Amino acid sequence: MPAPTAVAVRRAALADIDPCTLYLLAKLRQDVFTLEQRATDPDLDGRDLDPATTLMWLELPGAEAASLGVPGLPVAHLRVLVEDDGAVRIGRVAVDGAHRRGGYGRRLMGEALAHARESAPRAEVRIDAQAHLEQWYASMGFETVGGLFMEAGIEHVAMVLRPGHGAPSAHGTI
């Protein structure tokens, strides 16, 4: 099922995000990575502070958002980094549990890939995907480039999207 049209796509450097929205983004990551997935490594690694890091999220309007004075509540989030070798890295992909299987993850990944192509058209895009999502990322054109490894107590696999490849597919939502 595609994400509703009322969803808003946002992107900004950390310094440009209002405190309430930043809190809601941190809470979403905490809920998914720490509470739900029981990740063993800290989420806050300092890379969000890099001015070149772009935080991206989808938000939905509603009464709760209005009561907090923000345009919408974040339902999906990720960050886009630039590696030392010029490659783009997408990470910290999180979708609120109540909004999974609604197309939000795929929509946000599509936006992130478009952003990567605009900002670094010749760069490859890298992800360290949770192993159970390997096929989901493969459906967007990512190729597995390494074996399983543990990160934060969760099985991951290194994947890459080569320049000029990949397009969001209509199959498989998260």
Where are these regions (language model features)?
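Short amphipathic alpha-helix that is part of the acyltransferase structural core
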Residues: 2-51, 55, 59-73
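Short strand-connecting beta-turns/loops that link adjacent beta-strands
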Residues: 49, 63, 83-86, 164
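Short acidic/glycine-enriched loop/turn segments that link adjacent beta-strands
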Residues: 50-52, 85-86, 151-155
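Conserved beta-strand in the GNAT
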Residues: 57, 66-82, 86-94
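Conserved acetyl-CoA-binding loop-helix of GNAT-fold acetyltransferases
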Residues: 95, 101-114
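Conserved GNAT acetyl-CoA-binding A-motif
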Residues: 116-130
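Conserved catalytic-core motifs of GNAT/GCN5-like acyltransferases
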Residues: 126-128, 138, 143-158
